[in-house]
Amino acid sequence: AIATVLFPTLSRYASTAAETGDFRGFRDTVSSGLRHISFTLIPAAVVSAVLAEPIIRILFQRGQFAPNQTPVVAACLAAFSAGLVFNGAMLMLNRAFFSMRTNWIPTGIALGNLFLNAILDFALYRVGPWGIPLSTAICNVAGTWALIVVLRGRITRLNGREIASTVTRVVVASALVALVAWVVWKPLDSGLGRSFPAQVVSLGAALAAALVVYYACCRVLRVRELDVVLGLRSRLRRA
């Protein structure tokens, strides 16, 4: 969604850069998109990995889906979560190339990723079902790296310090979020039982606690993207 919203702005800056050679606006927009994607998807990935089992239990554990199948699917979700933020970054970087009318670059990288995915799927499926989503996660990392390298070569730099600063702060906040989510969920899961309403309560409480802790951590760590999101929310309320 972030990449889609920023696409018109990217296209405008790309057109200007093609005429003037000034990539500052384009560079700042790509950097902003990557930082906001990190702000939203890193904690989401961490929480979905840590709470994979209760999430799968609520969504699927009924009918022919037996309790002993839940850990297997939960492991797949946790493995897939490892590449979630990179998947979002790839969408943003693809839009950057599309706005520059160099569609062939992300297309070529995607084809390379397709072959890599096939090789890794063949190599990792033996470790268990979670090897397949892990392969996808690794390909997301590789694709993101390739897109960044090529894009930096075309626009000189990518505001790497700003991106690294945001990612570092968000990773620290997300680590605490993961700990709190687990600490809240585990005793509730043991105490309330495994009925569907009880699972909804325990998982809901863990997610609510995670959200509060993430907000507080981002405030303490001065994550600028939080202010942008809150400002957007205020403007939407006034609209």
Can you name each region flagged by the protein language model?
Residues 1-239:
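Membrane-embedded alpha-helical bundles of multi-pass transporters/translocases
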